[in-house]
Amino acid sequence: MKQTVYIASPESQQIHVWNLNHEGALTLTQVVDVPGQVQPMVVSPDKRYLYVGVRPEFRVLAYRIAPDDGALTFAAESALPGSPTHISTDHQGQFVFVGSYNAGNVSVTRLEDGLPVGVVDVVEGLDGCHSANISPDNRTLWVPALKQDRICLFTVSDDGHLVAQDPAEVTTVEGAGPRHMVFHPNEQYAYCVNELNSSVDVWELKDPHGNIECVQTLDMMPENFSDTRWAADIHITPDGRHLYACDRTASLITVFSVSEDGSVLSKEGFQPTETQPRGFNIDHRGKYLIAAGQKSHHISVYEIVGEQGLLHEKGRYAVGQGPMWVVVNAH
């Protein structure tokens, strides 16, 4: 299995393409100049395309991924109804979901043979919409509205329209600011990082009909931390044993272990990292974590080690200006 790491740097309007080897070393293979400030990225389920959101002309761009080395070639683009903050797809590769923090909406763009062809639905009134996350069963779209302390729940119809579920939302504690999410591999639990109080909520998916309950909330900061809380990203290892979340003010990654059933998180430690870590990701083997520093203009690679999943730095690399998004593709 070969792995390619993509780093989006909006200030220099670039995507850096890296090969990740078995020892955790990165080799730069391509630098793509993007027509706009590139931020969120996601790989299509069939691994043929990389979708990226750009501003100030709000669009989703599709880049064809070379199967041998992961190199990118521009393929198509489609307009968006707001500045793209987060981008994702359904598991079948039929739709792209884009959350827009500034516009307060989530949009659905239809894909034809992997290429974006146009918006089929937009839901407004999601103040501070920060991500759109499809459930493992491909039925429910979880959409955190950060400024409203709620996660809205939509059923995705066959033609890509979003239908509010009943109940239509779950709420966090006041002032939490739900932001990004991941799901446990067993499909029974979801984890949401809250930006404004730097906590992580564990949500139990009791059934496929929207019966959801918050079963744990954990503070992700050190006990003596008294500065402004400003959490950003969250990811889980493929085996579901280790979960990580980052805070930009403290420039650290919090390490959690996950109980076997996914219901309980335990804080294991903290890893100082690049300055203002806006985004990070984990490779497909669950062996390495790559973090980007929005203010350091570098990325660091860490090896995930031991039962606790602690991080040991393997290397550091210069990228573009203001790197914000990290995606890893296996091919």
Swiss-Prot record:
GO terms for cellular component: cytosol. InterPro entries: 6-phosphogluconolactonase_YbhE (IPR022528), Cycloisomerase_2 (IPR050282), Lactonase_7-beta_prop (IPR019405), N2O_reductase_N (IPR011045), WD40/YVTN_repeat-like_dom_sf (IPR015943). Pathway: Carbohydrate degradation; pentose phosphate pathway; D-ribulose 5-phosphate from D-glucose 6-phosphate (oxidative stage): step 2/3. One of its GO terms (biological process) is pentose-phosphate shunt, oxidative branch. Coiled coil: none annotated. Keywords: Acetylation, Carbohydrate metabolism, Glucose metabolism, Hydrolase. Signal peptide: none annotated. The modification N6-acetyllysine is found at K287. Gene3D superfamilies: YVTN repeat-like/Quinoprotein amine dehydrogenase. Belongs to the cycloisomerase 2 family. This is 6-phosphogluconolactonase. The lineage of its organism: Bacteria, Pseudomonadati, Pseudomonadota, Gammaproteobacteria, Enterobacterales.
